[in-house]
Amino acid sequence: MSAKDVKFGGDARDRMLRGVDILANAVKVTLGPKGRNVLIEKSFGAPRITKDGVTVAKEIELDDKFENMGAQMLREVASKTNDLAGDGTTTATVLAQAIVREGAKSVAAGMNPMDLRRGIEIAVQAVVKDIQKRARPVASSAEIAQVGTISANGDAPIGKMIAQAMQKVGNEGVITVEENKSLETEVDIVEGMKFDRGYLSPYFVTNAEKMTVELDDVYILLHEKKVSGLQSMLPVLEAVVQSGKPLLIIAEDVEGEALATLVVNRLRGGLKVSAVKAPGFGDRRKAMLEDIAILTGGQLISEEIGIKLESVTLKMLGRAKKVVIDKENTTIVGGAGKKPDIEARVQQIKAQIEETSSDYDREKLQERLAKLAGGVAVIRVGGATEVEVKEKKDRVEDALNATRAAVQEGIVPGGGVALLRAKKAVGRIHNDNADVQAGINIVLKALEAPIRQIAENAGVEGSIVVGKILENKSETFGFDAQTEDYVDMLAKGIVDPAKVVRTALQDASSVAALLVTTEAMVAELPKEAAPAMPGGGGMGGMGGMGGMGF
């Protein structure tokens, strides 16, 4: 085990705080409508330009190990917020930095870190309740477009496209973002289905960067039971190899010899293949397999109806234009099923929904209906250069995540106003323990950080903006950084999803409170480079050359 370098107390916190500041300062320049871009060097290919907080955070690695630990903890805030809400990563980073800074000052002044943490948690709970109380549901397509526009950095066409896509496939529908070959950004609605089963082996992956399996113009084998032996599969595998098309196997499970053979074939390039477990359980699994069979124009291979795996022909397999599989989900796009068959199945499910008395069954039937009838919307992002397309794609993905979050938990006034107004709820909390109260006050001050940063990125003094907003009694009064005017945020369409604001604060406070309570840091000592081999000593006996008159 290699030797470790250990830092304690103030020294540890100072180094950690430096790392937090370096990462947060790089991320927070992107906040708000007048936030700037960050240019990131890539080891190969053109540099990447982005305004997405989590993308910037993930690229930062520092030389000093103690500073790097602080930066990595803050990176965790951005990643967690991105995973849960899909947007709000920069806001979360700004909040975390503000809480860590104030917390470090309080600890240096001799306050108890554990009491500070308790105070931070009490205040955050009050803010979350306040945000949930203020949130109002998204009522119209226009409001969905507003949320998308704000998250896409004021790009109204993107907001409209997302609203259009959601209208077509429903709020629960599947929307994916792809790069377009042309200059235009457009929405394409494709019939399709998504279910929550990922690939059975990572060896099936075709796109190593995204860790996904992508199969085009694919055959789909649907089997009701487990597939474990190879012999029964050979006839259909040989037929698929001759056709030159990829194959997706959906079965109760694929294991043992069958899975091993498929993996070996995939690695040797003989057969482009992937396998996933069938979605659902019991009777519901069978019903979902039948749904997929109808959608893809295939036949469910089931011994109940007298079809064995050995006798399967290509005609019995389903077809789809594209299948995308990641670790957790499978999306089938452009199934070759006949329209009348799909329509008949939809009507059948609708009839079952009306007949059932169980809420759980009704919910599951509605899920199946959405998958069959909803389809998949694809937003194809275009641009003049690859760099521009990637930057725009980041913004579209953020906007899409924000609109989904808005549909789930409603919207609040944007531009940091919801957090600023929540100060009133925190101000009402009083605790007899002075250190717990100091923790509450840390959050009280941190709630101003996002709006200050938005104002400062727009070239306006943050304190003046905060003062003006707090003077006004209207709950929706705020600062429009785009026009540098004070407006009614809801009337102007400057809104944030309540889920994004809530998640940003919860993740920021959770990690920041842990950093504040840190008393020691341990890192590996850098290894000393091995000494170089000594140089050649010259040939012995050559020392008497001095008299040669050189």
From Swiss-Prot:
GO terms for biological process: protein refolding. GO terms for molecular function: ATP binding; ATP-dependent protein folding chaperone; isomerase activity; unfolded protein binding. Keywords: ATP-binding, Chaperone, Cytoplasm, Isomerase, Nucleotide-binding. It is found in: Cytoplasm. GO terms for cellular component: cytoplasm. It is an enzyme of class 5 (isomerase). Its main location: cytoplasm. Gene3D superfamilies: GroEL, GroEL-like equatorial domain, TCP-1-like chaperonin intermediate domain. InterPro entries: Chaperonin_Cpn60_CS, Cpn60/GroEL, Cpn60/GroEL/TCP-1, GroEL-like_apical_dom_sf, GROEL-like_equatorial_sf, TCP-1-like_intermed_sf. Together with its co-chaperonin GroES, plays an essential role in assisting protein folding. The GroEL-GroES system forms a nano-cage that allows encapsulation of the non-native substrate proteins and provides a physical environment optimized to promote and accelerate protein folding. NCBIfam families: GroEL, PRK00013.1, PRK12849.1, PRK12850.1, PRK12851.1. This is Chaperonin GroEL 1. It comes from Rhodopseudomonas palustris (strain HaA2).
